[in-house]
């Protein structure tokens, strides 16, 4: 399965800055009924631990345009508490995805927009995103415009 363009467009426009890789994993499980093939322990450019999820030919972080660096086994010790915390969240999400979505307002909003927003409107938002990025316009402005 390829990365979903509608989902990416919404994540990068109307929901920019609101979602993380755990949210993306939950949305993929809810919308597409797919579980990740692999879990990758990573850090972002600021050295913050982030758990990433690998699917057939894309990662959850790609929906958010995050550049992550996988960490080695030795580095896992440094991030042990963050790893434990995020793995616990993954277990909670997987245990009852429907309940998790119902109790997370931003994910409920995302799914509602994903299901109800027309392809034309999402395409327009994606086009605005491309134009704005080419001109160097900030994501926050794009989010407000969509």
Curated annotation (Swiss-Prot):
- The reply to whether Magnesium figures as a keyword in the UniProt entry is no
- Induction details: Expressed in the late phase of the viral replicative cycle.
Q: Which InterPro entries match?
A: Poxvirus_H7
Q: Tell me which UniProt keywords the record has, alphabetically.
A: Late protein, Membrane, Transmembrane, Transmembrane helix
What protein does this entry describe? Answer: Late protein H7
Membrane topology, record value: Single-pass membrane protein
Q: Please report a single Pfam family linked to this protein.
A: Pox_H7
